[in-house]
Structures are given as structure tokens and as C-alpha cells.
């Protein structure tokens, strides 16, 4: 029994094994088919992309050649600016639109937006110099200290008026150094030297005081100047006397007398007579005829308050 049952079981087991392997084969075939289809689709999409690129490149080349030919045919025609591309023509100021019955103009909303866009983009970072920039320590005003006030010129412009700069004050040092010492004349120096001599002699109790070498040099220079001036005066006098002869000396004295006679008025003699009342000698009293007057206080009747009578203590007590 055991031998008969074993081959039947084996046959059933084999069938079961083959039945289990069948779906795995189907899945493998399905996966292979899907992979092949995906590869074919990828290749087809890649080919379509490459074909599109080739078409766009060829069309761009043809359009560029056509545009170049058209630009060459025209006389330097300016290309129009697209919305995305930034061009120089867009940075120009927008045209003004005037009203029908007024002198003033009103910009349209498009032009105002363009103007704002233009001013935002045209402003450069180096518009203001370092001198105008804001510093943390100083005030927030961008103007320098010597620019004060502004004058309105146009819509977007202002001109700053420059205030006059003050001239710097001359520096005055309070210290009396050698470079800026007090200038004294020779006479003032002499006076100060004599005062210093007298004070030193009184303090030390010495009559003849020896001066230092610096002051001695000054005294020696003064003595030399005095001697030279006196010698020059004597030489000039001697030279003048030697040049003149004795006849010229006598003639010079006579000329001096004549000059004095011409310049001085002539004196007239006064004649005294009884008829001439003006030219009479004065009848002034002599010393012998003059009388000596006494003081008014000494004479009793010439006193200002009359005679004063002394009153004793006994008389004042009796009256009471």
C-alpha cells in the first residue's frame, strides 16, 4: 500500500509544483514586456525632443538671417524693445500730454509708472559722495556743514546756496617765548636795568654791583655807540672849520647879523610927554610908601561875627 500511494502523491506534488511556477513565468514575461515598452517610449520621447530642437534651431537661424537681411535693407532702423528685455530706449523720459484748455500738463498713469521705474533704476549707488553720506556720530543730514538752505529750481532739482566760510582766527599763544617776546626800546631796557641794579644793591647792601656778562655786553655796545656818535660830531665840526677861511668866518658873522636885523622888527624910541596919556610912566608906590595891613582876625571890629565874650561857669550857674 505504501508503494502504490507514493507514486500518486508524487504525481500530485509535481502538478502542484508546475501550477505554482506558471504565474511566476507570466509575471516575468509581463515585466519584460513593460520594460521593453518603457524603453521604446523613452527613446521615442528623446527622439521627438531632438527633432524639436533641430526644428527650433533651424527656424531661429532662418529668422536671424531674415532679420539681418531686413536690417541691412533698411537704413539703420531701431528695433522695438520687448517687455522683458531692458533697453536704452526705455530709460528716456516719457512724453508729456497736454490738456485741451489749460497750460499745465497732466502725466498719464502709464507715463508716471514709467517715470518711477526710470528713477528707481537710474539712481546709482555712487550718487552721493562720502562727504554727503550719513555717519553714525554726526547728524543725519546728508548736506555738509557749509551748505545751508536750498532754492527750488524745477520739479526734481534743488540748488543749494553756499554760505560764506569764516576766515580762521589767528593763533595767539599766551606764553611769552623767545619767538614772540615783548619788544622793548633801548631806553626802556636801560630804565629796567637801572631799576634792577638799585634793587639788587639794596638787597645785598653793596654800592658797586657787578653785572653778568650778557648785561655787560649791552652796556659796552651802548658806550661804543656814544663814543662813535661823539667822534663823528667832532670830526664834522673840524672839517667845516678847516674848509672855511678867516675871511669867510668874518663874512659869515656879518651875514648872520644882517639876517637877524632883517628878520627882527625895528625898535622905536618911546617919547614921554604930558599930552601922551598912554606912554606915561606908571605911578606905582615905592616900597617906602607902601603900608603893611594887619590880619582881619587880629583887629576886633573887623571880625566876621563881632566880639566874642568868654562866659564862665559861675555866671551860667547863677543865671539858671
From Swiss-Prot:
GO terms for biological process, alphabetical: spliceosomal complex assembly
GO cellular component, one term: nucleus
Its job: Probably acts as a spliceosomal factor that contributes to spliceosome assembly and regulates the isoform switching of proteins such as PARP6.
InterPro entries found in the cross-reference section: RSRP1 (IPR029656)
Record's keyword terms, sorted: Nucleus, Phosphoprotein
Source organism (scientific name): Danio rerio (Zebrafish)
Subcellular location: Nucleus
Family: Belongs to the RSRP family.
Superkingdom of source: Eukaryota
Entry's transmembrane regions: none
PTM section of the record: Phosphorylated. Phosphorylation at Ser-135 and Ser-137 mediates the interaction with spliceosome proteins.
Protein name: Arginine/serine-rich protein 1
A Pfam family that the UniProt record links to this protein: RSRP
Origin organism lineage: Eukaryota, Metazoa, Chordata, Craniata, Vertebrata
Biased composition (Basic residues): 75-102, 114-158, 166-175
Record field: compositional bias (Low complexity): 24-48, 56-74
Chain spans, region Disordered: 1-180, 215-299
Segments of skewed composition (Polar residues): 271-293
Post-translational modification Phosphoserine, affected residues: 135, 137
Amino acid composition bias (Basic and acidic residues), ranges on this chain: 1-22, 215-238
Amino acid at each position: 500500500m505504501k508503494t502504490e500511494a507514493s507514486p500518486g502523491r508524487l504525481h500530485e506534488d509535481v502538478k502542484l509544483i508546475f501550477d505554482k511556477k506558471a504565474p511566476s513565468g507570466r509575471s516575468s514575461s509581463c515585466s519584460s514586456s513593460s520594460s521593453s515598452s518603457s524603453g521604446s517610449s523613452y527613446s521615442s520621447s528623446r527622439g521627438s525632443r531632438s527633432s524639436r530642437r533641430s526644428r527650433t534651431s533651424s527656424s531661429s537661424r532662418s529668422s536671424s538671417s531674415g532679420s539681418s537681411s531686413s536690417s541691412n535693407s533698411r537704413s539703420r532702423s531701431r528695433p522695438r524693445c520687448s517687455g522683458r528685455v531692458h533697453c536704452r530706449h526705455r530709460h528716456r523720459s516719457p512724453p508729456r500730454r497736454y490738456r485741451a484748455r489749460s497750460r499745465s500738463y497732466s502725466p498719464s498713469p502709464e507715463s508716471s509708472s514709467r517715470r518711477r521705474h526710470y528713477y528707481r533704476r537710474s539712481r546709482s549707488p555712487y550718487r552721493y559722495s562720502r562727504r554727503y553720506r550719513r555717519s553714525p556720530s554726526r547728524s543725519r543730514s546728508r548736506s555738509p556743514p557749509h551748505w545751508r538752505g536750498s532754492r527750488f529750481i524745477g520739479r526734481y532739482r534743488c540748488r543749494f546756496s553756499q554760505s560764506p566760510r569764516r576766515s580762521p582766527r589767528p593763533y595767539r599763544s599766551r606764553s611769552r617765548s623767545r619767538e614772540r617776546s615783548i619788544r622793548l626800546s633801548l631806553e626802556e631796557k636801560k630804565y629796567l636795568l637801572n631799576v634792577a641794579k638799585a634793587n639788587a644793591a639794596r638787597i645785598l647792601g653793596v654800592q658797586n654791583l657787578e653785572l653778568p656778562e650778557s648785561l655787560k655786553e649791552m652796556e659796552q655796545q651802548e658806550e661804543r655807540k656814544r663814543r662813535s656818535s661823539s667822534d663823528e660830531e667832532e670830526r664834522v665840526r673840524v672839517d667845516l672849520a678847516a674848509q672855511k677861511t678867516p675871511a669867510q668866518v668874518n663874512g659869515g658873522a656879518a651875514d648872520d647879523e644882517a639876517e637877524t636885523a632883517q628878520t627882527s622888527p625895528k625898535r622905536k624910541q618911546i617919547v614921554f610927554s604930558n599930552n601922551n596919556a598912554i606912554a606915561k610912566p606908571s605911578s606905582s608906590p615905592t616900597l617906602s610908601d607902601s603900608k603893611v595891613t594887619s590880619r582881619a582876625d587880629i583887629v576886633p571890629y573887623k571880625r566876621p561875627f563881632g566880639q566874642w565874650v568868654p562866659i564862665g561857669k559861675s555866671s551860667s550857674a547863677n543865671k539858671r
